[in-house]
C-alpha cells in the first residue's frame, strides 16, 4: 500500500525510527509498538480508503481485534490528503470519535510577531531535562488520557530517536524550569517532522511556543538539511495561529477515528 498522506508518511517514519513495526497489507497497514501497547496511535490500522458504511466499519473493527486481541482501544487512520469529516461518518455512526487535523508545511520561516527573548532555548540533554519533559507532557492532561507509564514510555522512545541521530528535542527554559518543548526529526531525506509541541498551561500566551518553533525550524533547515518541515495541528485550537505566524501553511488534512478504552 502506497501512502499519499504526508502526515501519515511522517508519522510512520517517526514510529519506525523509534522501534515500531509497520506491516503492509493490500488494503491497509498494521502499525504496532510492542514497547508501548497502550499507545493508541502507535497501535492502529491505516486504511487505504474510508469505509463506505457501518457494515464495512464492523469488518475493520473485527480486523483490529484480530491484530490487537489485548487492546482496549480502537484506532483507525484513513489515507489521503483532502479528506473531510463526512468521509468518516460511518465511524461516527458506530459511536467512534472523529478527528480531522490540519497538515502544515514550511519551506522557510521567520520570527513570530512578538518573540520571547527572556527564556533560554536549548536541546534537552540530561536526565533531569527529560524528567521535566515527562512532567510537562502530563501538565494539564486528563490522567485517563495520558498516565505516567504511557508518557514515560513515549519519552523513552523520543530519547531513542535523539540517540539514533534523527534529530533533537528542544525546550524553552526559565531559571532551569522547562516551560515549552517540541521535537524535530528527519523523516526522510529533505523532510523533517515536528513532534508533540507542548507549552505548560501556566506559561501560555508569552510567545514561548512561537519563538521555539522558529528556532527549532532553523535547526531543521541548517542542521538536519531539511527542505520541508511538517507540522500537524488541531484546526480549532489557538496553536495553529502560532504556527502560521512563523511561516507554516495549511497543506493537507489527516483523518482519524478512535474509540477510547471504556471504564
Language model segments and positions:
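N-terminal charged segments
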Residues: 1-71, 82-84
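Conserved acetyl-CoA-binding loop-helix of GNAT-fold acetyltransferases
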Residues: 57-65, 196-201, 205-222, 241-245
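Conserved GNAT acetyl-CoA-binding A-motif
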Residues: 69-80, 220-232
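Conserved active-site alpha-helix within GNAT-family acetyltransferase domains
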Residues: 82-98, 206, 210, 235-253
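A conserved beta-strand-loop-helix scaffold within acyl/acetyltransferase catalytic domains
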Residues: 153, 158-198
Amino acid at each position: 500500500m502506497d501512502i499519499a498522506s504526508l502526515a501519515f508518511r511522517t508519522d510512520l517514519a517517526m514510529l519506525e525510527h523509534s522501534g515500531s513495526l509497520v506491516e503492509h497489507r493490500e488494503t491497509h497497514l498494521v502499525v504496532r509498538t510492542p514497547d508501548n501497547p497502550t499507545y493508541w496511535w502507535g497501535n492502529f490500522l491505516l486504511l487505504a480508503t474510508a469505509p463506505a458504511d457501518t457494515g464495512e466499519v464492523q469488518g475493520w473493527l473485527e480486523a483490529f481485534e484480530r491484530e490487537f486481541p489485548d487492546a482496549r482501544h480502537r484506532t483507525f487512520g484513513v489515507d489521503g490528503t483532502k479528506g473531510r469529516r463526512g468521509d468518516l461518518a460511518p465511524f461516527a455512526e458506530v459511536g467512534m470519535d472523529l478527528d480531522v487535523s490540519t497538515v502544515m508545511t514550511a519551506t522557510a520561516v521567520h520570527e513570530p510577531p512578538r518573540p520571547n527573548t527572556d527564556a533560554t532555548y536549548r536541546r534537552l540533554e540530561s536526565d533531569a531535562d527529560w524528567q521535566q519533559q515527562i512532567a510537562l507532557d502530563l501538565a494539564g492532561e486528563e490522567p485517563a488520557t495520558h498516565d505516567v507509564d504511557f508518557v514515560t514510555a513515549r519519552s523513552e522512545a523520543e530519547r531513542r530517536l535523539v540517540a539514533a541521530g534523527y534529530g533533537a528535542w528542544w525546550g524553552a527554559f526559565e531559571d532551569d524550569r522547562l516551560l515549552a518543548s517540541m521535537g524535530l526529526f528527519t523523516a526522510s531525506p529533505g523532510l523533517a517532522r515536528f513532534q508533540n509541541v507542548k507549552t505548560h498551561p501556566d506559561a501560555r500566551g508569552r510567545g514561548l511556543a512561537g519563538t521555539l518553533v522558529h528556532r527549532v525550524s532553523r535547526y531543521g533547515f541548517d542542521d538536519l538539511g531539511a527542505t520541508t518541515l511538517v507540522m500537524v495541528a488541531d484546526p480549532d485550537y489557538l496553536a495553529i495561529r502560532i504556527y502560521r505566524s512563523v511561516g507554516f501553511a495549511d497543506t493537507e488534512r489527516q483523518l482519524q477515528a478512535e474509540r477510547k478504552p471504556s471504564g
